[in-house]
Amino acid sequence: MKRLTPFLLFTLAAFAAVAPFFAAPPEAVAQKPPTLYQRLGGYDALAAVTDDFIGRLATDPQLKRFFSGHNKQGVTRIRQHVIDFLCLATGGPCAYTGQDMKTAHTGLGITDGDWDASVKHLIATLDKFRVPEKEKSEVLSAISPLKGDIVGR
């Protein structure tokens, strides 16, 4: 037992000497603020918002023409692209694999009025899901720069 005591003391002293080098720096321990994606509720919440939003667009007399040429699979594909895009745009882990906005909307003849109607539907959807004003504003700020790539193509 006496032979283990010096070894044990040496081991503890060595550990105490090197332990600070393995400790996480204070900035690594600090929590990152949650992303917009997380604050919105993650993937399932974005999927629910997308379903409601697309439902509104597809039944709006002004906008339903954009969905009339798509079968169920086509609408499902659009839905997935919207979810993936929103996920990525809000800091989520998704990968958007769709076309860039200009290419995807070329030839559709989307007008400023169509854009405005779509934004109103998005706001109504976010309100339906009781998205707080701060997060709603961040979502709208994330999509507003896309207007130039979508309208008038």
Name the predicted role of every residue range.
Residues 8-20:
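Bacterial N-terminal signal peptides
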Residues 26-153:
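Core of compact, soluble alpha-helical bundle domains
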